[in-house]
């Protein structure tokens, strides 16, 4: 009985990880920084700035912590 429960748990875990990986955001192709989205969908605090940059022909999201004067 315990072996069956462990097997079912492993199958559920495997399928949940598979479904999560299917929903992951794919990398966006680009040539320059202008080809990347201007604003990310993620909301941040005023002290953190998020922006995309084109690196190796893919848009990559960067986080920048702003300094207070």
From Swiss-Prot:
Record keywords, A-Z: Metal-binding, Nodulation, Signal
One example of a Gene Ontology biological process annotation: nodulation
MF-aspect GO terms: metal ion binding
Pfam families to which the protein is assigned, alphabetical: Nodulin_late
Signal peptide (from-to): 1-24
Protease found in the keyword field: no
The keyword Translocase belongs to this UniProt entry's keyword annotation: no
Other comments on record: Contains 4 cysteines arranged in two pairs in such a way that they might be capable of binding a metal ion.
Protein name per Swiss-Prot or TrEMBL: Nodulin-3
Organism: Pisum sativum
